[in-house]
C-alpha cells in the first residue's frame, strides 16, 4: 500500500513539474502577443499623453484606457519637483530619528504667511519645546542626536560627501548599540567614526585635519579610533597617498597633467618601497610639489604646506626621495 502511495505522489510531483514550464511558456507567448498588433503583427507603442496603445504600422488603437501611474503635475527641475511632491524625504541614518518625526518650523507665520499674534507665538514656542522633548525621549536618543550633529558639522567643514556622513552615522550607531561609549566622549567616538568612514570611502582626511574641526585632541582621537576599529572589526586598508592627490591638486589649481605626474611619482615610489613607514599625506604633498615643478607650474612649498597641513621640512625630505626614485627610473 505504501509503495502505491509513494508512486502516486511522485507522479503528481512530476506532473506539476511538467505543467509549470508549460504555464510559463504560455505566459511568455501571451506577453509576446500583446506586444504586437493583432491585425498586422506590427510594433505597438504607448501614447502616455492620450492613454492609448497604438500600432505603428497600421494605426490600430489596441487599447484606449491605459492608466498613467505617474504624478498629474509636471516639473522642469529638481527644485520644482521637490516643491510639488507630496511625499516625505527618504529615511536616513544621519538623523537620530531617521527623519521620521515631525519638525515644527521656526517661522512665526500661519498658512497664509501672516505673522502670529504674541499669544500664538508663545503657544508655538511651547509646542516646539514639547515636540523637541518627544523627539528625544531618553538619554540614548539625546546621545545619538548630539553625535550625529557633530558628524554633520565636521563633515561639512571638511567638505566630505553625503555617503561618508551616512557611513559615519552607521558606525556610530553600531558603537552605541554595542555599548562601546562608556569611558569615552561622544565627540571622540563621533570623530573616530568620521575618520574611519572617510578612509573606507577613499576620501581620507589626515588626523591633523580632523583635530582642527573636532573638540578632541589628536591623542584621544587616535586611541578612540583604534578601539572602535578593533571592537567593530572594521576592514580599513592602509591609507593610499594617491587618494590625497586629487584634493591637493584641485586646491592648488594644478593641471590634469600635473596630477597624472604626481600619481606616477607615487606609483614609482611604491615599486621601490620607499613609501613604507612614511606619512601618506607627506608623500602626496611632496609628489604634488614635484609634479608641479616637472610641469613648469608655479607652486611654492609654503602653499603646498598650507593645503596639506604639514611642515615644509617634511615636503622637502619626501621631495628629494621621490626625485631620487624618478632619476633611478629614468636611468633604468
From Swiss-Prot:
Q: What's the domain of life for this entry?
A: Archaea
Gene3D superfamilies membership: 1.10.472.170, Cyclin-like
Concerning CDD domains, the annotation shows: CYCLIN_TFIIB_archaea_like_rpt1, CYCLIN_TFIIB_archaea_like_rpt2
InterPro entries in the record, alphabetically?
Cyclin-like_dom (IPR013763), Cyclin-like_sf (IPR036915), TFIIB (IPR000812), TFIIB_arc (IPR023484), TFIIB_CS (IPR023486), TFIIB_cyclin (IPR013150), Znf_TFIIB (IPR013137)
Q: Name a biological process GO annotation.
A: transcription preinitiation complex assembly
Composition bias of kind Polar residues appears in: 1-10
Q: Show the segment(s) annotated as Disordered.
A: 1-36, 77-106
Disulfide connectivity for this sequence is: none
| Record field: compositional bias (Basic and acidic residues) | 14-29
**Zinc finger regions (TFIIB-type), where?**
33-63
Q: Which HAMAP family match?
A: TF2B_arch
Instruction: Name the NCBIfam families for this protein.
Output: PRK00423.1
Query: Any miscellaneous information on file?
Result: There are 6-12 TFIIB paralogs in this organism.
Q: What's this protein's name?
A: Transcription initiation factor IIB 2
Organism the protein comes from: Haloferax volcanii (strain ATCC 29605 / DSM 3757 / JCM 8879 / NBRC 14742 / NCIMB 2012 / VKM B-1768 / DS2)
Q: Which gene encodes it?
A: tfb2
Amino acid at each position: 500500500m505504501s509503495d502505491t502511495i509513494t508512486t502516486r505522489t511522485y507522479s503528481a510531483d512530476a506532473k506539476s513539474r511538467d505543467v509549470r514550464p508549460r504555464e510559463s511558456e504560455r505566459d511568455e507567448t501571451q506577453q509576446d502577443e500583446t506586444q504586437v498588433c493583432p491585425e498586422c503583427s506590427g510594433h505597438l507603442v504607448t501614447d502616455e499623453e492620450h492613454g492609448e496603445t497604438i500600432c505603428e504600422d497600421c494605426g490600430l488603437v489596441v487599447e484606449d484606457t491605459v492608466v498613467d501611474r505617474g504624478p498629474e503635475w509636471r516639473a522642469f527641475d529638481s527644485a520644482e519637483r521637490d516643491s510639488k511632491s507630496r511625499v516625505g524625504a527618504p529615511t536616513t541614518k544621519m538623523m537620530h530619528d531617521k527623519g521620521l518625526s515631525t519638525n515644527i518650523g521656526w517661522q512665526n507665520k500661519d498658512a497664509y504667511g501672516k505673522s502670529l499674534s504674541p499669544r500664538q507665538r508663545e503657544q508655538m514656542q511651547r509646542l516646539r519645546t514639547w515636540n523637541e522633548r518627544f523627539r528625544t525621549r531618553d538619554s540614548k536618543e539625546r546621545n545619538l542626536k548630539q553625535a550625529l550633529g557633530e558628524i554633520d558639522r565636521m563633515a561639512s567643514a571638511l567638505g566630505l560627501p553625503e555617503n561618508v556622513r551616512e557611513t559615519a552615522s552607521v558606525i556610530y550607531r553600531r558603537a552605541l548599540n554595542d555599548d562601546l561609549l562608556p569611558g569615552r566622549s561622544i565627540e571622540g567616538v563621533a570623530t573616530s567614526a568620521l575618520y574611519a568612514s572617510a578612509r573606507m570611502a577613499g576620501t581620507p582626511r589626515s588626523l591633523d585635519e580632523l583635530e582642527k574641526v573636532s573638540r578632541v585632541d589628536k591623542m584621544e582621537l587616535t586611541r578612540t579610533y583604534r578601539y572602535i576599529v578593533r571592537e567593530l572589526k572594521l576592514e580599513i586598508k592602509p591609507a593610499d597617498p594617491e587618494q590625497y592627490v586629487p584634493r591637493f591638486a584641485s586646491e592648488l589649481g594644478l593641471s590634469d597633467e600635473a596630477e597624472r605626474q604626481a600619481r606616477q611619482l607615487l606609483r614609482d615610489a611604491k615599486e621601490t618601497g620607499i613609501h613604507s613607514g612614511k606619512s601618506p599625506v607627506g608623500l602626496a604633498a611632496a609628489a604634488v610639489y614635484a609634479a608641479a615643478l616637472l610641469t613648469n607650474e608655479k607652486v611654492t612649498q609654503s602653499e603646498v604646506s598650507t593645503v596639506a597641513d604639514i611642515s615644509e621640512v617634511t615636503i622637502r625630505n619626501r621631495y628629494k626621495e621621490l626625485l631620487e626614485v624618478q632619476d633611478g627610473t629614468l636611468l633604468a
